[in-house]
Amino acid sequence: MIEVVDLFSGAGGLTFGFQNTIKNNKFVSRNDFNIRFANEFNHDAAEAFRQNYPRVTMIEEDIANIDEHFLKSKGISSKRVDLVIGGPPCQSFSTVGKRQYDKRAKMYREYRRILSFIQPKMFVFENVYGLLTMKNEQNGPIIRNVKESFNDLSSFGEASGYDVYTKLINAKDFGVPQNRERVFLIGIRKDLKIKFEWTFPEETTLNNEITLRDAISDLPILGNNEQKNNYICEPRTEYQALLRGNQTELLNHVSRNHGERLQKIMRALGEGQGKNDINRMVEDGILDKDLYLTSGYN
């Protein structure tokens, strides 16, 4: 059994990936990974994790407060952990909106601190594409700081550092109906002297990428601030069948109550258009001046 710790767990996306596999187009549980505990500070996300994984110990706590003594007080051993997984908050690294080198951008240091006393054989660190392009306080690449911090843990005493391998992966290449790039850092503890090589399932191509239609064409159309609880048809694609599983009732199909201003913006946007197109229409007098967008839209 491989012992795993999930940091910055959110609702449990990474845990799901390690606890499940796909057989005959169905998600089935796998028994070779044991999630010893998960950590999440956001209450709603922690509650969602508890609902999704009731058998996993959830530590709802600021990660800065977690150390060996804290875990021991909770009856949790920090010894003989094989793998740490997690992706620190990504808002600061995101390419959408204003990017700031703030406290959230430095949360990888807490991840590193946890590594120093748990000393897993390996870690998986996931984050957004912006991690590769964001600058630190000295205007250098933040990714260099992150990798170097994992390479050398000598400031924590005798803790062994990690050889770090980096790769940019796009979810659309692996069966997800979303053009979503993510940076993965894999760390192997140096004393193990293991060379890591990236291996993946066969990538999808333009001919077999899963489209938005493939994913949601079985869902009813919603108006503003509306909810519907029935699928409009049987699954039309393998992807829909996989995600639906044995569920017959449609859950959480609810539209937001968008204000009139945002509705006007959405109605004005054509396929592939964004903030610059809206602003151009404002400047050309096609749209009202109050629709001009300053940040947060791409």
Each language-model region and where it sits:
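Core alpha/beta nucleotide-donor-binding catalytic domains of modification enzymes
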Residues: 2-119, 129-133, 137-143
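Class I S-adenosyl-L-methionine
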Residues: 73-78, 88-296
